Amino acid sequence: MTELRALNPFKIKDRLQFIEPYTGLCSGKITTPHCTGEFFLQGGHLTSYHPLDQKHPILFLSDQSQFATSKPIRGGIPICFPWFSAHPSDPTLPAHGWARTHLWELVSSSMIDDDVQIEMRIFKEPFELNLVARFGRSLKVALSVTNRSDELYSFELALHTYFQVSNIANVHIDGDLRKCPYLDQLTAVEHPAEDRPITFQQETDRIYDGKATDIRLVDEGWNRTIHITAEGSESTIVWNPWIAKKKRMADFGDEEYLRMCCIETGNVRRRAVPIAPGETHTTSMKIHSA
C-alpha cells in the first residue's frame, strides 16, 4: 500500500494532486489547460482522459468497477502483461497477467510545456515495466519492458483501452485495420483482410494481425473521431462483450456495452515478443480526438 504522504514530492501545484478515493487505493488527479485525467498506482492504470474541448470523456470507466486492492479496474487503460487472456498452460493464474492488479511505483512527475507527464514502474522477475503517460491535447502512453534476467524470455502485452461512445450502433472503426487479417476469438476462425469499416451488431472479439499505425474510431452520434496512432505494436484487439457476456461480468452494468468499445494496442499470440537479456521493447500509442 502506498501512503498519500509518500506521494507529496510528486505533486505539481494546480496540475497534479493525490487522493485516496477508495480504501488502500491512491490516485493522481491531473488538470492541465487542455484536459483532465486520472491514474491509479494499482495496475499502473490510467482511468480518465477528458480533453476540455470535448463534451464527453475519451475513456470509458464502468460504474460497476470494483475499486479494491488486487482487483482489476473495469475501464480506462488496463495493462495486460505478461500474457493476454487466459494463461496458456495454467488455468489457475489470472486472466491478462499480473500487471493490472499489482501496485506500481510512481517514479517521476513533470510539466512539459502545458502537459503533465508521469512515469510509473514495476519489477517482477524477470521483467521491469516502465509506463510513461503524457496528458495534454493528446494522450501519449508508452510501455517499456526490459528483461532483467540472464535468459531469453517472451511476453504478450496489450494496452486494453476502453473508449467511451455515444451508442455502439453509431460507431465504426476505420483506418489501417482494413488491411489486416484477423482471428475471431469467438469462433477460432481466421479471416483475411476485409477492406471495410468495422461495425458492431453482436459480441465482437477479434485479434487483428499486423502493423496498424493509424486507426480511427468514428462516432456519428457525437460527431467525433478518435485517432489512435500506435508504434511497437503488431496486434490490435477489438472487443465489445454485447448482451450475453456482460451478464456474466459482475463489474459491468447491464447497458454499458452500448457505451463502450475496446481498441487495444499490443503484441499477442503469434506476435508475442521474444526479449533477450538486457533488451527493452517499447509499445506506445497516441490518442487524440477531433
Q: Which stretches of residues belong to each language-model region?
A:
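Beta-strand-rich N-terminal accessory domains
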Residues: M1-K71, T213-D214, V218-E234, P277-A290
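Active-site/ligand-binding surface loops and adjacent short beta/alpha elements
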Residues: L152-S154, Y162-T236
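Membrane engagement elements in two modes
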Residues: T2-D14, Y22-K29, P72-W83, H87, ...
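Beta-strand-rich interaction surfaces with strong enrichment in secreted/lumenal proteins
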Residues: A68-T69, N130-V132, R270-I275
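Hot-dog-fold acyl-thioester-processing enzymes
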Residues: I58-A99, H227-A250
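Acidic, contiguous internal or C-terminal segments within carbohydrate-active enzymes
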Residues: M120-F155, L159-F163
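Extended, loop-rich substrate-binding clefts of extracytoplasmic carbohydrate-active enzymes
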Residues: E20-Y22, P91-G136
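Acidic/His-leaning functional-site neighborhoods
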Residues: H102, T199-I275
